[in-house]
């Protein structure tokens, strides 16, 4: 008999994409700038929607956003915005699309300043994952501080809640539930 896995309560046990995301990505310390960029960009589109919606559109976003290369996205023009607005496979919100371009430029500025986005984002915790007690919270002093800095740099559609969620996803905040099989000791 196969042992049933215990996952964080937010995982829909009927959704294989969500399960795969939880089991293979969420909370795993992420240091690859390309993957970090993808998550930050997707988080822009998540505002007001469920993360499951974004995960189900992820491959469409990868195609529409040319493999999530920040240099390419930063150069998107009005014609590309219009084309994205016609793409039923992604979230078609003009403000979010325009924001994704602005945020890509800010992302590249941060990479230029710090050498990598990884150095920037993990620098807030001196490269260490912070153990979070598993409770229902949506922000933290750390997410507040990072949000304030990103906004100062010109990023849009970033709030402490979305940054908190991203910090959990990339492993800066280690937040698997106490009874989750993926929680690290």
Give the predicted meaning of each segment.
Residues 1-185:
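HhH-family (HhH-GPD) DNA N-glycosylase catalytic core used in base-excision repair
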